[in-house]
């Protein structure tokens, strides 16, 4: 297929596909957990989505049942047997890990006591891809002209789709964006950000950042010391503190 432009919008497969043409896409899937309760007789069908940030939980009504999911600070990378997303895994499920989810489920039962009386109809574990800073990956890739990335939505892809599509289309048509969206521009990353040792450790932290406090200039704690300045050791001896640039 010959074309003038290509948009890579293949979700958690994007990193693997782009690697075949030496393009770096820094994202990787984590395991994402939720449960669906048995029917709860007195649940309000108009119940809004509840978010308990202190306990990393979201809860929403689902056809008379309650769906409870978690964005935990100690996430698990998916597909760790070979660190490759299977080509045919669309809408697939990962093995259950109730021990990992149980502490958050207990907190959910404390928040919504009726949940503890209803039972669990479905325990779900599926892959969801995340980026090194929990921001999108948009724009033309530095390695290949006219190859645009549209992905890395960190579990909020549905709500982001309209705006991301609009930005991508305008970027392709005009060659640039009038607004300052550098925090979403894929060019903010370097090649090493997509290497397995970096990205698989970093996404254990970034999933939880969805429900963490977004302090200004917050520093990540994972995947540090990947690239150091020449006088790093000298500064350590002088008592310096370091941050990610």
Label each region the model flagged.
Residues 19-21, 35-77, 96-99:
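Mid-domain catalytic core of redox enzymes
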Residues 46, 54, 63, 77, ...:
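C-terminal catalytic lobe of FAD-dependent flavoproteins
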Residues 24-27, 51, 117, 178-180, ...:
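A short alpha-helix-loop-beta-strand transition element characteristic
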Residues 38-39, 61, 68-72, 122, ...:
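Pocket-edge structural micro-motifs
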Residues 3-46:
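Central helical "cap/lid" subdomain
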Residues 1-5, 9, 162, 170:
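Helical element adjacent to the flavin cofactor pocket in flavoenzyme catalytic cores
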Residues 222-245:
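Long, low-complexity segments enriched in small/aliphatic residues
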């Amino acid at each position: 297929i010959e074309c003038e432009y290509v948009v890579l919008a293949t979700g958690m497969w994007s990193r693997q596909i782009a690697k075949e043409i030496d393009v770096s896409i820094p994202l990787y899937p984590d395991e994402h957990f939720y449960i669906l309760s048995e029917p709860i007789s007195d649940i309000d069908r108009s119940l809004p989505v509840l978010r308990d940030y202190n306990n990393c939980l979201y809860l929403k009504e689902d056809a008379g049942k309650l769906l409870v999911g978690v964005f935990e600070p100690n996430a698990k990378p998916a597909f760790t047997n070979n660190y490759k997303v299977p080509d045919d895994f669309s809408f697939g499920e990962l093995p259950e890990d109730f021990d990992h989810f149980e502490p958050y489920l207990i907190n959910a039962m404390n928040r919504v006591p009726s949940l503890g009386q209803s039972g669990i109809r479905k325990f779900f574990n599926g892959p969801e891809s995340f980026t090194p800073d929990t921001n999108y990956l948009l724009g033309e890739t530095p390695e290949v002209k006219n190859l645009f990335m549209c992905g890395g939505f960190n579990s909020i892809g549905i709500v982001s789709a309209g705006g991301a599509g609009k930005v991508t289309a305008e970027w392709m048509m005009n060659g640039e964006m009038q607004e300052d969206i550098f925090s979403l521009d894929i060019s903010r990353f370097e090649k090493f950000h997509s290497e397995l040792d970096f990205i698989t450790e970093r996404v254990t932290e970034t999933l939880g950042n969805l429900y963490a406090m977004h302090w200004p200039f917050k520093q990540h704690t994972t995947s540090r010391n990947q690239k150091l300045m020449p006088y790093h050791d000298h500064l350590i001896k002088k008592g310096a503190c370091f941050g990610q640039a």
